[in-house]
Amino acid sequence: MSNLPFLLEIGTEEIPDWMIVPALGQLRDSVQALLDGHGLQGKVSWVDATPRRLALRADGIIERQPDSKEVKKGPPIAGGQRAAEGFAKKQGIPVESLTQEGGYFVGVKMVTGRAAADILAADLARLIRKIQWPKTMYWTGGKTGPRFIRPIRWLVALLGGNVVPFEIAGVQSGAVTRGHRKLGASSVPVTVENYRDSLAASGVILAAADRRRKIETEIAGLLEGTGLKVHADADLLDTLVFITEHPTPILGGFDPQYLELPSEVLVTVMRHHQKYFSVEGADGKLAPNFIAVMNTNADPEGLVRRGNERVLRARFNDARFFWQVDQQKKLADRVADLASVTFQAKLGSYLEKT
């Protein structure tokens, strides 16, 4: 009996970055529990994801469960031969094979193992729908339709060289994935073995670790010889890894006049509003530069860079306006305004609390 590899891909609209890793953990555990529970002997080899797909591979799955014996407890011996014959007929076993134990007829039934493909086909839709998300949505069939974090657009399920057939919300599983929205094809045939390479050829870097490495390496290349260094931000890096399928960093700049604002204001605008890395000079002070990560492979004409610079300039202008307005009134002079902010209906305002 040969051992088979299994590939599952759930293709969706873009999933929020912070929800992806927990979902992958659930998917891994659910598939492994399915394999273990049915005695299929396989092990999940890896799980990985991009914003548009959750993917899993398992290896060593046997084609069919081993046949097994199931002991069935029958009617009391006092019921006689007729009871024994009825029990044997119901179980599909010869009446002469029955034994007597503890005052009851007992039969041993041979159970033919199910094909792994049939088990997977029967359970995969349930496992996918069982993934727990902080929020879910309907996208077809109204409130009677399935719920998921984002609409499911395609499904890949392959056991060895064969499709494992199942369906969710009218989407049938197959052997065709989708490439990068801009760099790849909308229809990419795959096998279990060429899955990663086929995605790569269609502009998708499947492994989160590879996307992370690409971002870090290319940022280092951008800053080499400039005397600048990126402000390390592990959380932002995690976000960028899971909002891109083909990340490419670009170095942009802004007018040094904005450095008159507190660095905390500028970094907050770049990091939280634009998902940019801030950049520091050799002296450790904020430099008039930033690093954005685009979801494509190149910006030969600088259009993406200039677009990001234009957006950041507008953000900084807004920040400067509010900073200047805030400075027109001392903090101590704002205490009286707390009278209009309720702390708790029965306890009074924040001024009274202060």
Spans of model-derived segments:
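Catalytic nucleotidyl-transfer cores of nucleotide-processing enzymes
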Residues: 152-153, 231-352
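Long, basic N-terminal domains or extensions that often function
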Residues: 1-266
